[in-house]
């Protein structure tokens, strides 16, 4: 028995009416995970024992009829701490790390009665855009197993797209929720920086990281954000939740909404079919009553360079804690303290992680700080100001999520710059701390194309409103890959 084609609200009704139990739903979800796992490699850990214990406790306490997420399974990216469940960040360095606490986002989800069924595969320490840098092997795209699923939240996206789970959590530092959502044809949101606590998230770029939700539909995505968003004293950068219900505007029309279409987002390097899909989406928004006009974000072209200086610099600092002494991998061939440090880190980290540590260390080094890190911070300010100018006159920004559809596995592994450029359209959103969503907008070569909507800070409910209006009048989100049971 499978329930993966039922929405969260449909599942809730079945649970409340006792047509199914939380244990039965969890068991069915675990079977969906296992039956697809060999093809996808989307999980690092399947937490069967812990999930069934949680489900039994919820059944004994009774489903909360007023809480739509009570008894619903949840997959969690492997860089988000889960009490008693391995949390490896898909790295050899943390191959045996089992936290003794839940990340705040996970704790919030559990408080709502959600059941953690496993930890999803990812690029190592969230460093990568293809899902291929994991110590545990590459995740496959749900639509075509010869293609990348995007990254770094590769497993979280593939798991939802393939029907392994209905909901999952990812993290987004430069596009790591939105790009895999686009490549797998689902809905992924990066919230405003500070909306979801980073406590318990294994840090990559602390001024950029944000936990966010994956789901098949816009409303289900918003329901999960409702569950995980909170101010948190354990995260000094968390902000008060300004929206009581992120679904509040879903279903409202968008007549008169002003949407900006940056010319830079449809320029050089954008696949022609992706460009055509986004222009058609813009026309669709106009048919729904929105006003779509071209604007300019002149400094967005510097986003990738700025990001890789700032993110790598922050990573080089954050990853200093992995030294082979306190926890995680320790080299066995070391004979003194220096060798423990050097050998453990050189053997425990993968090539992409070491590349970024080197870049960040160089950018922060004496004599180069002003030329690189300081200048990157100054250009980041210009990118923020570009967005502020546009949002003075417009409600949202529209564009593609990625310059292309999913590409072949192992096709860009030896060209890191080309892979970095795949995040060209998502990175500026992180640099500015803004919310952004990717929703399905069409297909090219049989693969999903993602549309990105960006809003000013704390405008998630408006983003969901526009995304839901598009979704309600198209059927791209209804199409499913073969592994789920679709025709594609």
Curated annotation (Swiss-Prot):
The organism sits in which domain of life? Answer: Bacteria
- Class of the enzyme per the UniProt entry, highest EC level: ligase
What's its catalytic activity?
L-glutamyl-tRNA(Gln) + L-glutamine + ATP + H2O = L-glutaminyl-tRNA(Gln) + L-glutamate + ADP + phosphate + H(+)
Q: Name one GO molecular function term.
A: ATP binding
Q: Which PANTHER family match?
A: GLUTAMYL-TRNA(GLN) AMIDOTRANSFERASE SUBUNIT A, TRANSAMIDASE
- Describe its function: Allows the formation of correctly charged Gln-tRNA(Gln) through the transamidation of misacylated Glu-tRNA(Gln) in organisms which lack glutaminyl-tRNA synthetase. The reaction takes place in the presence of glutamine and ATP through an activated gamma-phospho-Glu-tRNA(Gln).
From the Swiss-Prot or TrEMBL record, give the protein name: Glutamyl-tRNA(Gln) amidotransferase subunit A
- The gene is gatA
